[in-house]
Swiss-Prot record:
NCBIfam families: PRK09653.1, pta. Its main location: cytoplasm. This is Phosphate acetyltransferase. Transmembrane segments: none annotated. Keywords: Acyltransferase, Cytoplasm, Transferase.
Length: 336
């Protein structure tokens, strides 16, 4: 069973509610039809102009049976959501009138549905930019109490258990959101990646914070090393509930014999299934190298660290990409 198949199966069992704010888009509607057909969600909310959604569905021959269309401009929740949004943003100088206008936007309205418990998961990005999706998430939903940083991860399936990880599966983080994380942000990313490991891989995380240096081999003057080292100190200070170590080079993290030589007292020997990269460049290059130069499958990026589950799509996504992202995001909502 592939990772996507396992996520869809788990979503069927979880039976959570999904909100889709790009419901005037043909791919979104086709994905919603498949989600209903496969029973992946308990309920599917389509947010947008009702007339435009139905026109798109009619033009494309998509049956909207068993889906709920919500038009923000006439929704019974519009005033309540506008007031809530105003309370969240008034420190930025927003007026109640502007809040009401902003709540006409399907993306913001869907995010508020998620925030207020009317849905369990949100997926967007087929039309909206990543920046807009992240902004809606951060301004309306916010991050988990335990972290201050929203980030992302990939699930990497190397299709080769001999390479390590958990049955050949790894979490790579952060590969899509924060260009140059601070030490505090790196610690947050490690915590979120550990939770993603539990959610997606189903095993206890063993986290390696990566660097070009292993335990001081690169000296003590480079800020890039010091940030990772400080992140490790912060994790110790937080008394996190997962095994971790750093700073470590990749081979010292993954190859037990090299770990024993370069970091003989490391608690992670032979057990790493979660890799935290020092910056976005290394993370993005790293996952693409593994994907393109081996027989690995890369799934993601999946957002992590938000108070409620939401996912960002590539604007070039296929219908099945949307279905997969929805299944993953619904699985993230299970247990929250």
């Amino acid at each position: 069973m592939t990772f996507v198949e396992s996520m869809q199966r788990r979503a069927v069992l979880a039976q959570k509610r999904l909100v889709l704010p790009e419901a005037c888009e043909q791919r979104t509607l086709e994905a919603a039809r498949l989600i209903v057909f496969r029973n992946i969600a308990a309920k599917v909310f389509l947010v947008g102009c009702e007339r435009d959604i139905k026109n798109t569905a009619d033009r494309c021959g998509i049956d909207l049976t068993d889906m709920v269309v919500i038009d923000p401009s006439v929704s019974k929740h519009r005033d309540q959501f506008a007031e809530r949004y105003f309370q969240k943003r008034k420190h930025k100088g927003i007026s109640l009138a502007q809040a009401a206008e902003d709540m006409r936007d399907p993306l913001r309205f869907a995010a508020m549905m998620l925030d207020q418990g009317h849905a369990d998961a949100m997926v967007a990005g087929a039309e909206n930019t990543t920046a807009r999706v992240l902004r809606a998430g951060l301004t309306i939903i916010g991050t988990l109490p335990s972290v201050k940083t929203a980030s992302s991860c990939f699930v990497m399936d190397t299709n080769n258990p001999r390479l390590g990880g958990t049955r050949g599966l790894f979490i790579f983080s952060d590969c899509a959101v924060i260009p140059t994380p601070t030490a505090e942000q790196l610690a947050d990313i490690a915590c979120s990646a550990a939770e993603s490991c539990r959610t997606f891989i189903g095993e206890e995380p063993t986290v390696a914070l990566l660097s070009y240096s292993t335990k001081g081999s690169g000296g003590d003057s480079d800020e890039n090393i010091l940030r990772v080292r400080e992140a490790v100190r912060i994790l110790h200070e937080r008394r996190v509930d997962f095994t971790f170590d750093g700073e470590l080079q990749l081979d010292a993290a993954l190859v037990p014999k090299i770990t024993e030589k370069k970091a003989p007292h490391s608690p992670i020997t032979g057990k790493v299934n979660t890799l935290v990269f020092p910056d976005l460049s290394s993370g993005n290059i790293g996952y693409k190298l593994v994907q393109r130069l081996s027989d690995a499958d890369a799934y993601g990026p999946f957002l992590q660290g938000f108070a409620k589950p939401l996912s960002d799509l590539s604007r070039g996504c296929s219908v099945e990409d949307i279905v997969a992202a929805c299944a993953v995001t619904l699985v993230q909502s299970n247990g929250r």
